[in-house]
C-alpha cells in the first residue's frame, strides 16, 4: 500500500504534506492549545482534520486556512465540523492575519501542523502580525524548534532565534517521532508555543534595521562582527556599547542586537538597499 495515502488522500510532496495520526500526540497538542469557546481560533493547514476535529469539538466557530483545494472541499462537507468552519482556500504565506483579527474583533489564536518546507518563511510572515495574534502553537521540524528557542553561544542560535525572541516568548511543548505521521517524515518533529510579548523587552525603533543587521551577521557567522558588520559599526562604537568586536554573530544576545539596531536607527546610518 502507498504510504503517502491516508484516509483516501494522496499526500502531495509540493505542499510538504505529512498527516498526523497518533492519538496520544493529538490529545497532547490539543491540551497544550486549550481552545475555549468565544476565542478567535485559526488553524493553518488543517489537512485531514487530525487537530481540526478535537479542537472544533470544543468550539462554536473555527477558521481554517488550507491551500490544497481537495482538502478544503473535504472540510466543507465534514459531517459535524462543516457548519462551524470558515474556510479560506488560500496560501498562509500571503494571508492577511491583521485583517482577520479586525474582522473577528479580537487577537487570533493560531495553530497548525505546518508544512516543513515553508515553516521558516511562514514564521517571519506571522511575526509581522504579532500585534494581531494572542498566541501560536505549531508542529514543526525539531531542528526549527531548536533554532526558535536557542540562546547565544550555541550552533542552533541564528537569525530565526533572534527575530522570534524579539517578537515572542518561545516555549517548547513536546517532541514528536516520525511514526506519528503518514507518511512518516525523515526528521523528528516538535511542538512549540509562541506568545507575542505584551510589552517588548527590547524595543527597537525600526525592526527592518534589526532584520538587516541579523541577516548580515549570520550570513557570515564564522567571521567576527568587526568584519561581518564592519561596514555598519566601528570598533569604537561597538566597544562603547559594551559589545566585544571579536565576538561572532552567535555570541551576541537579542538585547545586544536590539541595542545595535537602535544605534543605527538613531544615527540614521543604515541606507535602505
Curated annotation (Swiss-Prot):
Its EC number is 2.1.1.182. SUPFAM superfamilies: S-adenosyl-L-methionine-dependent methyltransferases (SSF53335). It catalyses: adenosine(1518)/adenosine(1519) in 16S rRNA + 4 S-adenosyl-L-methionine = N(6)-dimethyladenosine(1518)/N(6)-dimethyladenosine(1519) in 16S rRNA + 4 S-adenosyl-L-homocysteine + 4 H(+). It is an enzyme of class 2 (transferase). GO terms for molecular function: 16S rRNA (adenine(1518)-N(6)/adenine(1519)-N(6))-dimethyltransferase activity; RNA binding. Pfam families: RrnaAD (PF00398). It is found in: Cytoplasm. It comes from the Bacteria. GO terms for cellular component: cytosol. Keywords: Cytoplasm, Methyltransferase, RNA-binding, rRNA processing, S-adenosyl-L-methionine, Transferase. S-adenosyl-L-methionine binds at residues 18, 20, 45, 66, 91, 113. Belongs to the class I-like SAM-binding methyltransferase superfamily. rRNA adenine N(6)-methyltransferase family. RsmA subfamily. Specifically dimethylates two adjacent adenosines (A1518 and A1519) in the loop of a conserved hairpin near the 3'-end of 16S rRNA in the 30S particle. May play a critical role in biogenesis of 30S subunits. This is Ribosomal RNA small subunit methyltransferase A. It comes from Escherichia coli O17:K52:H18 (strain UMN026 / ExPEC).
Amino acid at each position: 500500500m502507498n504510504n503517502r495515502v491516508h484516509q483516501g488522500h494522496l499526500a502531495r510532496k509540493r505542499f510538504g504534506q505529512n498527516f498526523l495520526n497518533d492519538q496520544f500526540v493529538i490529545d497532547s497538542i490539543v491540551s497544550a492549545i486549550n481552545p475555549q469557546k468565544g476565542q478567535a481560533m485559526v488553524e493553518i493547514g488543517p489537512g485531514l482534520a487530525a487537530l481540526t476535529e478535537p479542537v472544533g469539538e470544543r468550539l462554536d466557530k473555527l477558521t481554517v486556512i488550507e491551500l490544497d483545494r481537495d482538502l478544503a472541499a473535504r472540510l466543507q462537507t465534514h459531517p459535524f465540523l462543516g457548519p462551524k468552519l470558515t474556510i479560506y482556500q488560500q496560501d498562509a504565506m500571503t494571508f492577511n492575519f491583521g485583517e482577520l483579527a479586525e474582522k473577528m474583533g479580537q487577537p487570533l489564536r493560531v495553530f497548525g501542523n505546518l508544512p516543513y518546507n515553508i515553516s521558516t518563511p511562514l514564521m517571519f510572515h506571522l511575526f509581522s502580525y504579532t500585534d494581531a495574534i494572542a498566541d501560536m502553537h505549531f508542529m514543526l521540524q525539531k531542528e526549527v524548534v531548536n533554532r526558535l528557542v536557542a540562546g547565544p553561544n550555541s550552533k542552533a542560535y541564528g537569525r530565526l532565534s533572534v527575530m522570534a525572541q524579539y517578537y515572542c516568548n518561545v516555549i517548547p511543548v513536546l517532541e514528536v517521532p516520525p511514526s506519528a505521521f503518514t507518511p512518516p517524515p525523515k526528521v523528528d518533529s516538535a511542538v512549540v508555543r509562541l506568545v507575542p510579548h505584551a510589552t517588548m523587552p527590547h524595543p527597537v525603533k525600526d525592526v527592518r534595521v534589526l532584520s538587516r543587521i541579523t541577516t548580515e551577521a549570520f550570513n557570515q557567522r564564522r567571521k567576527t562582527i568587526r568584519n561581518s558588520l564592519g561596514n555598519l559599526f566601528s570598533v569604537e562604537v561597538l566597544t562603547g556599547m559594551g559589545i566585544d568586536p571579536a565576538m561572532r554573530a552567535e555570541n551576541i544576545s537579542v538585547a545586544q542586537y536590539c541595542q545595535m539596531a537602535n544605534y543605527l536607527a538613531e544615527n540614521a546610518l543604515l541606507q535602505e538597499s
